[in-house]
């Protein structure tokens, strides 16, 4: 099993290109199941989760070709051979559930295993299922699988009011609604850029959608969808992660393809901590102002609030801030599993339920640490960049699910980092 070796204590200077958004691409790929015409995605990230979704779609009979080194995906579902998404594939990634709505909407039936993925608290699929039930689907959970059937004549438009904001449930309902009979209104819908990106792609395919980016999305169902070519939106989580690298280490880095509107609430916290963020012609330039980073309080919220997927990385920054910071996690349970690993590096962190209290220290110390999930893995790498001595991060297979070429991108800016094959 591979690990990452980081030698800290140096400034970073240079440019880092930001990839297409993993979370957007994982929703866009199943959209091919809605049509028998080709869907081409450009600016696709090259990640293990994308390969898992490719494997899942191919198991259903879809064709997926990876072109231009993986940056272009050519998909076609003109002749599905199966409507069963097996546990052996689905268990690897929670986004696998996103094949349910499209298959049900287009062909009227689907069998999908309950998903796996990151071990972060309770992330139930109930919201997905209730949305599809509102459209008339008959659902039966047995033997670890969701058995779904559409009513005679197909799914029906409906009013779907989500009790809590859910990105995945919004995506599944949005895709299903494009082929439902009549009008579907999604209330308390997720507003993330990935939702907007999916809606734009579906509209290119012929869907009639209004209101994406707001809490209410209206979909007028159509009889069929066509093909399209669509660029995957910039990955705001990768963007925020690499913005923290010069914030933690010092120096100045330009993030190519970055846009303020993708990370507005995050930028506000960086500014309060003493980090400069400037727009450039090609992206964003980030530098730490003079002196030590200042403590700030952070509460994770659905977009446009502070993203939960940047909480672990932000904690790495605040471990060496002047003063005490309070981080409140309101999206997922049990999402401070990186805290004990950071304390091995000398961080002072107290966790009580969904709140972490971080008292900054002047320096972290390198240590052997273990990644517990995707975002925790990169937070430990960031901490290692600022620590004295060497840090070895094990179980980095988590990292490969969400970050492409992380060692290359950081070493190009002067970081001492390399992968140790397992």
From Swiss-Prot:
Reaction(s) catalyzed by this protein? phosphoenolpyruvate + UDP-N-acetyl-alpha-D-glucosamine = UDP-N-acetyl-3-O-(1-carboxyvinyl)-alpha-D-glucosamine + phosphate
Q: Provide the positions where the record notes the PTM 2-(S-cysteinyl)pyruvic acid O-phosphothioketal.
A: 118
Q: Which GO terms describe its cellular component?
A: cytoplasm
Q: What is its EC number?
A: 2.5.1.7
Location(s) in or outside the cell:
Cytoplasm
Q: Which residues cross the membrane?
A: none
Catalytic positions? 118 (proton donor)
Its gene name is: murA
Give GO terms for biological process.
cell division; cell wall organization; peptidoglycan biosynthetic process; regulation of cell shape; UDP-N-acetylgalactosamine biosynthetic process
Gene Ontology molecular function terms on file: UDP-N-acetylglucosamine 1-carboxyvinyltransferase activity
Give the function comment from the record.
Answer: Cell wall formation. Adds enolpyruvyl to UDP-N-acetylglucosamine.
> What is any Pfam family matched here?
EPSP_synthase
The pathway is:
Cell wall biogenesis; peptidoglycan biosynthesis
Q: Name the keywords, alphabetized.
A: Cell cycle, Cell division, Cell shape, Cell wall biogenesis/degradation, Cytoplasm, Peptidoglycan synthesis, Pyruvate, Transferase
Q: Which residues bind phosphoenolpyruvate?
A: 22-23
* UniProt family annotation: Belongs to the EPSP synthase family. MurA subfamily.
User: Could you tell me which NCBIfam families the record lists for this protein?
Assistant: murA, PRK09369.1
Q: What class of enzyme is it?
A: transferase
The name this protein carries in UniProt is UDP-N-acetylglucosamine 1-carboxyvinyltransferase
Which positions bind UDP-N-acetyl-alpha-D-glucosamine? 94, 123-127, 309, 331
Organism's domain of life?
Bacteria
